[in-house]
Amino acid sequence: MSNVVIIADDLTGANATGVLLARKGYKTATFLQLPQDPLENGNRFDVISITTDSRAVAPEEAYRRVAEAARAMLGNKPGLFTKRIDSTLRGNLGPEIDAMLDVLGPDSLAVVVAAFPTSGRITVGGYLLVHSIPLEQTDVARDPKTPVHQTLVADIVAAQSKHSVGFIPLATVLQGSTAVMEALGAQKEAGKRIVVMDAATQKDLDTIAHGAYLSGLSVVAVDPGPFTEALAAYVLPKPKQGRGKKVLMVVGSVTALTRQQLKAVENAYSTCFTTVDVHALIDPWRNAEEIERVSGEVLDHLDDHQVLGVRTVEEAGQVLDLASVALAYMISEEEIASRIADGLAAIARRVLQVSHGEVGGLYTSGGDVTVAVCQALAASGVEVKDEVVPLAAYGRLIGGAFHQTPIITKGGLVGNSDAACTCVDYLLTKISNETYPAE
């Protein structure tokens, strides 16, 4: 049986949400028309995404198409129905949400989360901001087919829907999943059939998803993709994967830009960074113990996160004064840098070896670190395939025990604050349906 059914108003949206789940290892298919045999396809795919091509049609026709699609998939008894909406709220939002609620019955509750943090869409105070600009001040207001002239999400939905619309602010989300659970229950008790929620980060989306799950309500996810991705984790069984779909980031750069980039990754993905004790890596008496500690911590969090990372600093105050440290250890600054890079590389090797293929791709930042990682993995080099952003290359390791492992290498002063997110997103997409030669 299909566990997740996505109903989108256009093909691009159907694919965009589907790929978020596909890259987690779930078997996903998009259908241009209703599947002739929904039950058969439900057995073949974990996720079925259907496009109704209804964004620019009359509201009554949009309602009919979505209702037909939802009704056709009811026999699959999916654990989650999703109404995929445009990230700039174009189209027949109200009629299509109404159609879903009418088909799924009076117990269903539409939870609208319009945020898409990795695409610059956040909702705060009920307002949708696109790269910090109010929605109505963006080009979507001049869209020739489906312009949007408002920014308040609840108002946009309420103007089109026959159902009562509630709102849960960011302040509640920041209190945690229990607060979200209680707020959703209160909205349902108050007779709301649609609830709009704020979210500014991936962590917020995860919190909302967990709260929705804890509520036990029959939630219909209404969003451009990321909320569905987060909520599906509570519906779908963990996929069986021959090789891992996780990314390991090994970051030696200590620049302010790098710290901004890593913070953006933490906000966008389920991420766990471990900060090394660089003094321990430098000290030959403590080096092995620190490598074991950090690699163990990374491995402990492997099952719970999509992106794992090892870094040398978290805050500006942790940046080493190489000259004074070199003087204290009576070695050169170059040797200090080399010991740190070698320590990071040893941690990466240990994680890859012990995780037994759970890590599907590498991201390295800092030239010394990239060289050290290649050497630690006995790779003779990187087969370069593409440029992700200027001065950030995607390729595959050449030789060694991890031959052909996907890798992105980037300098510490490369790109804007979103550059690391772009690289991680690229790498996750590349490895989502990756196949590897038998070992």
Swiss-Prot record:
Catalytic activity annotation: D-erythronate + ATP = 4-phospho-D-erythronate + ADP + H(+)
Annotated function: Catalyzes the ATP-dependent phosphorylation of D-erythronate to D-erythronate 4-phosphate. Can also phosphorylate D-threonate and 4-hydroxy-L-threonine, with lower efficiency.
Sequence positions that bind ATP: 253, 366-369, 412
Family per record: Belongs to the four-carbon acid sugar kinase family.
Species this chain originates from: Heliobacterium modesticaldum (strain ATCC 51547 / Ice1)
EC category name: transferase
InterPro entries, sorted: 4-carb_acid_sugar_kinase_N, 4-carb_acid_sugar_kinase_N_sf, NBD_C, NBD_C_sf
Keywords (A to Z) from UniProt: ATP-binding, Carbohydrate metabolism, Kinase, Nucleotide-binding, Transferase
Gene Ontology terms for molecular function: ATP binding; kinase activity
Protein name: D-erythronate kinase
EC number: 2.7.1.220
Top-level taxon of origin: Bacteria
Pfam families given in the database record: NBD_C (PF17042), SBD_N (PF07005)
